[in-house]
Amino acid sequence: MISDVLSDATTRMGKAVDAAKTDFSTVRTGRANPALFSSLLVAYYGTPTPLQQLASFQTPEARTLLITPYDRSALNDIEKALRDSDIGANPANDGNVIRVVMPELTEERRKEYVKIVHGKAEDARVSVRNVRRHAKEAIEKLVKDGDVGEDDGKRGEKDLDAATKKHIDQVDELLKNKEAELLGA
């Protein structure tokens, strides 16, 4: 019973870490990264469609991204969506592909992005702690109802705390890497 609670909590904590990883990948670092465009919606035949469903991405150089639409009639719609986005890139349409050159980040902008990343990391930590709180309540309920012994409950809470620490450490490691990437890029 406690193992089910721990297994579920560990899975949900892992999902929180994965969500943080995804969030971090959407923060610009000055390098061309297709993940920057993962949340960008293009008005394709009047329907908001994720850019990743409309085109393939290549990075021929560190700061250049080539976007090749599967349907060439979508070129202008994709270009318009890129121009209207807050990514800060200037797309160039040559009739076949869209070339996006990522501008260098200023020191001020880098520090702003570091603050954003810290906020996303804190959100992930809170998410992990919430999972821990719910799992701890479930373990306490099992002990209170007499389904498991008090020793097993304490052992389960100790294992839960270890899993929580492990997942928060993973978020901190992701944060450290992203911060180094932002400030060192």
Curated annotation (Swiss-Prot):
Q: Which Pfam family is one of this chain's hits?
A: RRF
| This protein's record includes keyword Plastid | no
Q: In its UniProt record, which GO terms are filed under biological process?
A: translational termination
Cell compartment(s), UniProt: Cytoplasm
Coiled coil regions, renumbered to chain? none
Q: Which InterPro entries match?
A: Ribosome_recyc_fac, Ribosome_recyc_fac_dom, RRF_sf
| Family annotation (Gene3D superfamilies) | 3.30.1360.40, Ribosome-recycling factor (1.10.132.20)
- Which terms are listed as keywords in the entry? Cytoplasm, Protein biosynthesis
Q: Which family does it belong to?
A: Belongs to the RRF family.
Job of this protein: Responsible for the release of ribosomes from messenger RNA at the termination of protein biosynthesis. May increase the efficiency of translation by recycling ribosomes from one round of translation to another.
Q: What is this protein called?
A: Ribosome-recycling factor
Q: Which organism is it from?
A: Kocuria rhizophila (strain ATCC 9341 / DSM 348 / NBRC 103217 / DC2201)
